[in-house]
């Protein structure tokens, strides 16, 4: 087991207490061991190398496996601890650039320049030629750009995201290879890097270890997390050995830079040049500008889908359902559902919600390319919906005066009630609860005479239908007049309160 000083990440410092575990009767799960399993450090993971392995990321964020140089007998965990200890020693003497203020002398050190070129530089070239009129947009090139946008986009949503990151379905090698190759056309990094950072996002949503932590602001979660160098102090890991076991993932990662250049720029340029005699149009519109649009659409999942929309399933974290984002990302905008049910191959569950990715996954399953499509049960989905609705109702209830709580009221026996009634002529018993109606007699809808006949008496039967079956609103008005509970009738009082939604723990009442 790790020694003191180990930097295995725990998800939350606040853990619920379990009496059975703390008493020693039942063993607790070893959190350190469980986190080692969650990061995959108990498994052998050969390193996959390429020329730009950290494309769209940074070394601090993607150091998933470790170099084989040195002691070959060291486990992944041993290498991790050794590297973490080295970083700790360096941190004692050197403050990371992300923790330093921006100045005219160091501003360039804050930036991830590779990503600046990929995310900002190349789009600027494309927009310059497009907006200046140097390369006009023709209809055929536009239509092809839209088609190719869909090819690259679906390769990300159905491939990178739902197939590899979440294993929401399985696919045979032709489909996996297609997604691996044309996922490169979106210039969003290799599937290995993309899937690793995405699994970290789900494991540490809305924490400092979340690569695109929405709490750090809209701009940071949209693009800042890629354009700025991340603090290695908050580096996190997730198990992706299932991904590295896939030969299509290994092939793509090894050759990512070549595949990216071919699919993102060379292929659209050649197709538009050969079929439409417009090489420059293919490069600018089907290449640079298409990449810019698909990148920005994907970034909206990390940003807008955590800021705009509804939270019908849970509101403890920031993800939201947003139909606007769903339109440009082939159905990925229903983010609240996705974070609650991540292994469901669907992101949208209602017929009118836009999710072409789930349709494509379903269609590929019909022709035998995809299989084992996973869905959460409708019962589990309904449970989440009802729990969230109840949470909203409880918040509204907390803002309303529901009358005195029964446990805060004094306990009277019937003799005490009779004695008090001689002093206060407005007391009446209904369902085991004493109410002071003296200030309500003149407002009683049934008239003063009827209510006066109940003073100093038990009017439960008359109130509950013997004379008039009072409405729910009448019961709520009556609850504001509570002054005591009759000891002999406390069970009736509890039943009345429970009908109004009041909850009292069994065995702790009075």
Curated annotation (Swiss-Prot):
PROSITE patterns in the record:
CYTOCHROME_B5_1, CYTOCHROME_B5_2, FATTY_ACID_DESATUR_1
**Motif Histidine box-3: where in chain:** 335-339
Residue window of motif Histidine box-1 = 161-166
Topology in the lipid bilayer = Multi-pass membrane protein
Q: Per the UniProt record, which residue ranges are transmembrane?
A: 113-133, 139-159, 256-276, 281-301
Report which reactions are catalysed by this protein: octadecanoyl-CoA + 2 Fe(II)-[cytochrome b5] + O2 + 2 H(+) = (9Z)-octadecenoyl-CoA + 2 Fe(III)-[cytochrome b5] + 2 H2O; hexadecanoyl-CoA + 2 Fe(II)-[cytochrome b5] + O2 + 2 H(+) = (9Z)-hexadecenoyl-CoA + 2 Fe(III)-[cytochrome b5] + 2 H2O
The record's listing under InterPro entries reads:
Acyl-CoA_deSatase_haem/ster-bd, Acyl-CoA_DS, Cyt_B5-like_heme/steroid-bd, Cyt_B5-like_heme/steroid_sf, Cyt_B5_heme-BS, FA_desaturase_dom, FADS-1_CS
Q: What class of enzyme is it?
A: oxidoreductase
Stretches of the chain found on the membrane's Lumenal side? 134-138, 277-280
Q: Which intervals of this chain are the motif Histidine box-2?
A: 198-202
Q: Which UniProt keywords apply?
A: Electron transport, Endoplasmic reticulum, Fatty acid biosynthesis, Fatty acid metabolism, Heme, Iron, Lipid biosynthesis, Lipid metabolism, Membrane, Metal-binding, Oxidoreductase, Transmembrane, Transmembrane helix, Transport
Q: Cofactor binding mode, per the note?
A: Expected to bind 2 Fe(2+) ions per subunit.
**Where is Fe cation 2 annotated to bind?**
201, 306, 335, 339
Necessary cofactors: Fe(2+)
Which residues of this UniProt protein bind Fe cation 1? 161, 166, 198, 202, 338
Q: Which residues form the Cytochrome b5 heme-binding domain?
A: 409-487
Provide any one GO MF term from the record.
Answer: electron transfer activity
Free-text note regarding domains: The histidine box domains are involved in binding the catalytic metal ions.
Family membership: Belongs to the fatty acid desaturase type 1 family.
Known function: Stearoyl-CoA desaturase that utilizes O(2) and electrons from reduced cytochrome b5 to introduce the first double bond into saturated fatty acyl-CoA substrates. Catalyzes the insertion of a cis double bond at the delta-9 position into fatty acyl-CoA substrates including palmitoyl-CoA and stearoyl-CoA. Required for the biosynthesis of membrane phospholipids, cholesterol esters and triglycerides. Regulates fatty acid desaturation, that is, the ratio of unsaturated versus saturated fatty acyl chains, by competing with the acyltransferase STC1 for the common substrate C16:0-CoA.
Q: What is this protein called?
A: Acyl-CoA desaturase 1
This chain is encoded by the gene named: OLE1
